[in-house]
């Protein structure tokens, strides 16, 4: 009896510390769970901030590329201006001298001076008509006035802008032709093509040899200018017509290769599989799932981001 009483006391003493330890561990686990939830919320917020920063980086990179291009162009123009600055100054001096001369010419090209000059020429050269001389002098006066206006516009502008405009004119892209050739694609459904019989339509390529054509070009290089201009105008106004025959519903063939004349377009449409809304959604989700990892790898390579590998869980030691 005494032995049994002693064993029961020992078991009661062992249960008390175990329950206290369990309570402590439960409290610790609850605190850890709270901390984990707070950290997960902070991680989500940081991910959103990272996405915003990535978008800002993209925009900043585009702005940097544009600024670098502008800086290169400006540096080139400044170098050219430094090299040719004395020549530009001499040009402006000559422009001012020409303007002073034009003022003198305008005074001399007045109506009284023109009439006196016409009368003197009429007396010296009796064969010439006075009207023709007057028109010639009047045209010359108009040329001087237009040239004077151009010089005033050059004098008001800065040398840098004048030089940039000159550079654009010299090194600019080649001017496009006023009347480019057109390519007209015609279908069998077009009424104009349906009127043309099939015998008249030529689908064969030109049989002329390329080497002969190149020799003819070399021989005709030294022809007259007027003939060249007429050929260029013909080439500009000519249109390239391309006839594209399309299959009708009567010419649709079976799998065996036999033509079915009685088949209708409705039967052909029914043979094709129909896609439901669920199938479209499933395919779109699949495409997105395939595209997401490739985007992640691209962002890592562009911005040198660390790889998002899953953390390895270390095995806990057994008590």
Curated annotation (Swiss-Prot):
Other facts: 'Shugoshin' means 'guardian spirit' in Japanese.
Gene Ontology CC entries for this record: chromosome, centromeric region; condensed chromosome, centromeric region; inner kinetochore; kinetochore; meiotic spindle; nuclear envelope; nucleus; pericentric heterochromatin
This protein's name: Shugoshin-1
The keyword Cell cycle appears for this protein: yes
Effect of residue 294 to A: Loss of function
Organism: Schizosaccharomyces pombe (strain 972 / ATCC 24843)
GO molecular function, one term: chromatin-protein adaptor activity
Post-translational modification: Ubiquitinated by the anaphase promoting complex (APC) at the onset of anaphase, conducting to its degradation.
Family: Belongs to the shugoshin family.
Function: Plays a central role in chromosome cohesion during meiosis by preventing premature dissociation of cohesin complex from centromeres after prophase, when most of cohesin complex dissociates from chromosomes arms. May act by protecting centromeric rec8 from separase degradation during anaphase I.
A Pfam family: Shugoshin_C
Listed result of changing residue 300 to A: Loss of function
Keywords: Cell cycle, Cell division, Centromere, Chromosome, Chromosome partition, Coiled coil, Meiosis, Nucleus, Ubl conjugation
Source taxon at top rank: Eukaryota
UniProt key word Ubl conjugation: yes
GO BP: cell division; homologous chromosome segregation; meiotic centromeric cohesion protection in anaphase I; meiotic sister chromatid segregation; mitotic sister chromatid biorientation; spindle attachment to meiosis I kinetochore
InterPro entries found in the cross-reference section: Shugoshin_C, Shugoshin_N
Result of changing residue 299 to A: Loss of function
Coiled coil region boundaries: 33-62
Compartment(s): Nucleus; Chromosome, Centromere
């Amino acid at each position: 009896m005494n032995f049994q009483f002693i064993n029961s006391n020992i078991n009661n003493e062992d249960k008390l510390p175990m329950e206290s330890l369990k309570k402590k561990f439960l409290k610790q686990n609850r605190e850890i769970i709270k901390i984990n939830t707070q950290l997960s919320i902070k991680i989500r917020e940081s991910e959103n901030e990272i996405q915003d920063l990535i978008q800002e980086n993209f925009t900043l990179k585009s702005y940097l590329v544009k600024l670098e291009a502008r800086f290169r162009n400006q540096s080139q123009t400044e170098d050219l201006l430094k090299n040719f600055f004395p020549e530009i100054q001499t040009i402006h001096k000559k422009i001012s001298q020409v303007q002073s001369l034009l003022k003198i010419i305008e005074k001399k090209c007045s109506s009284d001076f023109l009439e006196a000059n016409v009368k003197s020429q009429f007396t010296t050269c009796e064969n010439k008509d006075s009207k023709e001389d007057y028109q010639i002098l009047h045209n010359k006066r108009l040329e001087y006035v237009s040239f004077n206006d151009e010089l005033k516009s050059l004098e008001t502008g800065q040398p840098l802008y004048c030089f940039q405009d000159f550079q654009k004119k010299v090194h600019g892209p080649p001017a496009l032709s006023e009347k480019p050739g057109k390519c007209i694609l015609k279908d069998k459904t077009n009424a104009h093509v349906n009127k043309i019989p099939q015998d008249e339509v030529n689908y064969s390529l030109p049989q002329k040899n390329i080497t002969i054509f190149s020799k003819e070009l070399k021989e005709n290089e030294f022809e007259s200018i007027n003939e060249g201009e007429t050929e260029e105008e013909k080439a500009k106004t000519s249109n390239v017509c391309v006839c594209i025959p399309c299959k009708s519903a009567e010419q649709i063939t079976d799998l065996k290769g036999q033509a079915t004349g009685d088949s209708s377009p409705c039967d052909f449409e029914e043979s094709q599989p129909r896609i439901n809304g669920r199938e479209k959604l499933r395919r779109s989700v699949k495409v997105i799932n395939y595209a997401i990892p490739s985007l992640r790898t691209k962002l890592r390579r562009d911005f040198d981001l660390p790889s998002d590998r899953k953390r390895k869980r270390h095995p806990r030691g057994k008590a």
